[in-house]
């Protein structure tokens, strides 16, 4: 939680390193060593605090420990993937754990880590596409760009062809068929 959050938005920092988690309850040293290492604290302040919402409904968000460590690990996997087979892996969180915001933090960090790639967020449901697009749109200042929703396969292709870097584009998998040619040959697209 942040200073403007209700008590229900506060959570414990339960890991020092992202590997082991004290599930019973958080210890002070776990919180202190997990969050207040100099480099990590500066990273959290720079990359893991954002504002979401609009107008009077705007609020500050601070990543939880599980989001911080998962996003940092995903960024490292993405860097490796660009030098190897191109496969970054799967990002998994339980329901209600802040997956959408983890994705926002990830997209934000990718811009620096991979030299301004285009991020394509592909979902299997229209309602999920709309939900994620709305969440990312509310965080456009943090992302330093305005997300776009592709309305068709042709629109997606033109969005990819019309840029050499940057962009966060939302689409559904229903716009594709098996055996199709790639929509782009660019190497700096993260799906």
What function would you assign to each model-found segment?
Residues 126, 147-157, 172-178:
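Conserved helicase motor
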Residues 121, 169-171, 191:
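Hydrophobic positions in the central parallel beta-sheet of the AAA+
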Residues 1-118, 127, 131-143, 164-168, ...:
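ATP-dependent helicase/translocase motor core
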Residues 1, 148-149, 191:
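Short, hydrophobic beta-strand segments that form beta-sheet elements in well-ordered domains
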Residues 178, 188-191:
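Short, intrinsically disordered, charge-balanced linker/junction segments flanking boundaries
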Residues 131, 178-179:
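Phosphate- and divalent-cation-binding pockets in alpha/beta enzyme and binding domains
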Residues 151-169, 182-186:
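Conserved motor-coupling elements within RecA-like helicase/translocase cores
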């Amino acid at each position: 939680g942040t200073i403007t959050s209700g008590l229900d938005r506060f959570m414990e920092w339960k890991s020092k390193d992202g590997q082991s988690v004290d599930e019973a309850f958080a210890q002070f040293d776990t919180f202190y060593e997990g969050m207040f290492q100099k480099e990590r604290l500066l990273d959290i302040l720079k990359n893991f605090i954002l504002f979401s919402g609009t107008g009077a409904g705007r609020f500050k968000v601070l990543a939880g420990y599980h989001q911080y460590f998962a996003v940092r690990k995903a960024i490292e996997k993405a860097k490796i993937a660009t030098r190897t087979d191109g496969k970054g892996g799967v990002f998994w969180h339980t329901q209600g754990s802040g997956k959408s915001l983890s994705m926002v933090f990830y997209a934000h960090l990718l811009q620096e880590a991979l030299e301004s790639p285009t991020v394509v967020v592909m979902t299997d449901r229209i309602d999920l596409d709309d939900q994620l697009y709305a969440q990312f749109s509310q965080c456009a200042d943090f992302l330093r760009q305005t997300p776009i929703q592709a309305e068709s396969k042709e629109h997606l292709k033109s969005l990819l062809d019309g840029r050499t870097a940057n962009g966060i584009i939302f689409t559904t998998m229903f716009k594709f068929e098996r055996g199709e040619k790639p929509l782009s040959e660019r190497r700096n697209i993260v799906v």
